[in-house]
């Protein structure tokens, strides 16, 4: 077991095994069985490339052997920052064959985030494209390797400069090693299969260990409530590093059933609608902001989208009007809302739930042994129908962040329930309704941004005396960030200058404020904290005056 990982208590592990939730098989062994069973079926389509399950397994095996040649070993951590291309699947499953632990970084992460992941995890390698959207990832990895001696390997998809390994060459190169060597590697199903990421409210990223046992079960249960089967075809358009497109049911859930996954490295309607028509896509997972963009694109009426059966929507609450308009434009589809978190617990509206229930709720847990508590500020369970903080425990919900004992003491109850920070109410149907959140996060199009992280950076600006970042409503993204700033005497600051300053700190683009409010003072709570409710109310009133709300 990797040091710093919090195991499930033995009594719970025994229960989950006895009930058949945990099969004590690694993702490597699960994938090997899938590849043998569905060998001739197409697994992935990436633009004009079609790859069968057998071909995917063969290339992942060859890559795994070559990664062993380059010095990677079981339990080594590897930062994976690849776009939605077939090489992602080759690399992901190659790491599983070795027993390495991928760290699922987003393409938008920059030096600040990636260097933190490397430091927290002790990562041995990092893989990324050479360039994407005018950003040079080779320069990023070179800087991080210079700062962190544990990062031994830089692997590049595309043009690999001197000192880097070419991912394409590693996939194609024959190894002198035997594939049997991979089978001899012992993988503990209770070890992490991967690390998902959680920004949290402190701004310091945390690593979420998802074990082989819990992540296989996660994918199977998500597939069971989304009508996945061998004849279904998924369009994966959200970044594969996210939990939803990877395993809820995502790529893993469709593979388990021998389905087909079409990868898209764009979200534009002009690219997506032809893909749906050409490949007869049955399932797609989105965030509300993306769905809103699609249904407002005039091109949507020019393509045959009648193959679509399920649109999963997650990350934010979907407004009933958007659901109604989607159904009007694509009568064949059921919009299935879900609530999930990389930490584990998933809630899905069931496809056969009553229309009123689907309109009002985000679903209910997918496992019979998922445990939910709604509690008040003193951890007392609230009365039925009342709002409380959502606490979760179950066979695929983590028991602790990696290497974070002090934070874990605050993030979990003494009996192992995870404190989500989300406020919920139980619907009479048994499903749940999201009512807000306790944690200081801004939800921009499904990406959760720590207000504290951005505030700490803004406070380093020489013109800033104090700052509070708050969400402002947005019809498409749900929320955008507004920075409320008190300036130092005699100083001035404009939004473009603030954005440029933050960009120099090399944080992800989605964390940049999109509105700046200069204020004389902040209302303080009785405990001396800035009243963010007062700020959001003041800005909401201003937006109404401007006709923007």
Segments from the language model and where they lie:
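Gly/Ser/Thr-rich phosphate-binding loop
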Residues: 281-285, 295-357, 367, 371
